[in-house]
Amino acid sequence: RRDPAIRAADAARLVALYSHGVDPAHRRLKLDVAGGPPLPPTLIQAGGAEMLLADARHLAADIRTGGGRCTLQVWPDQVHVFQALPRLSPEAVKAMKHVARFIDTSMRDNGIEAISGKAV
């Protein structure tokens, strides 16, 4: 399925520009979450219509394999960074409320009180 925000060829060109002259197999270009220390609680939100959806699923699996806690939310029919587009996507506001609750819960679970003292 085609990503409405960017073509695959354009995304590949951006990666090539970023890593120009570096072997694609170089360890600095590979994210090894599963082989490192466990990450803190992580929330990943991905749009169901974005080309990075498979990457989001892979990252969530790696975080869990590495002993971390990860919540993956896939928002149907949404594009990459839909959360930044509340005028175009009503789901953006709902998604950001999930983010706020996730942060609040993660902080409370670790004994950190919100600065305002108000629960989200």
Where are these regions (language model features)?
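Alpha/beta-hydrolase superfamily serine-hydrolase fold, recognizing
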Residues: 1-120
